[in-house]
């Protein structure tokens, strides 16, 4: 039976009054005609027939699915030497993971620009959505300029790609629905909320789709400056006005910021992770430093927090840095900023201190990948493989090189993970963690994670994207 330890927790659920300038009608940011990407470089000749195979499984969201498993079941077996077949220089840094939809690779940059490339990585369309926010407009932060950071998501029912762009001037966050075939803006809507300063909020988490809504999560700028509170905002897929949101009932903080964004379970519920909040030892529980399960109305229906959640708040440690990884419909696994890795029971998260197992394994930042009962964690001292047995107990299987810290994905019989500082993609042996092959792709942000499509590994970099052919 599902725990209701948090059923009485207050959830901020409102219908937002949206500004007239950001209604659900079509918008018209400047478009660019299809053509070659300027400054693109290619390390191997790629003809029209050499792109990812037609019919290869799409990768329409962060780590491929709303469960964030990070697995391609159609990628052919990786063999031989990895080849970087494309290095495409775009107009800004790429923090978001690429997504792949109907054979189109969609890439968003921090310049508030979105590109679509065909299976031979030729540009199909390019859409400029406006001007990003420069660093001088914000009190803190580590991205300059700040444009599109959260990974977009595709919805097959509307045929739209959804993404959030931060715009400069009067800092604001705008949700866009783009037609996937043309890049045309179908509608856009402000997703800034009352009670906080837009310039102090950052939209880093990947967008998700559940219950006919697109879900957008918010945390703070790097440095936790100003007036911010964590948010999860749900917007109807048609851009309608019935916008709902959840915010932890804390005075300040509780950012829901990890790049994984909401994880969606088999019931269609959102599993989100709130970071440090304002409640310290002796204060009442405020749903920070927690895993929160939200229903279709953005109400908290279950939660988990470590027994030391309040002390973690005080020390700015604990949970928040890694998204929830799901093992089937039984277990949920996550690490954080301190070292403990937790196993929780799906459907009964356990409340405060109610984990099934916890072991001190590593500091984990980003999104994990899951294959069977094994979770591959993005540890700051190197990816680890951790098995969860039938009783929910953790067993570390291997630990790769301490420089390979990127959020991993799985396909073609390999674990794909980045040494982001060196700009190197590694193909790891799933059994041992040994690097079987590697290739230079260019320096990437610390949270960078690839997309998989056909035989290709598509890597976001600080210059654009690199494409590696794995077989």
Ranges and model annotations:
Residues 1-10:
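Bacterial N-terminal signal peptides that target proteins for export
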Residues 17-20:
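C-terminal motif of bacterial Sec signal peptides marking the signal peptidase cleavage site
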Residues 22-37, 43-471:
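Noncatalytic, solvent-exposed loop/strand surfaces
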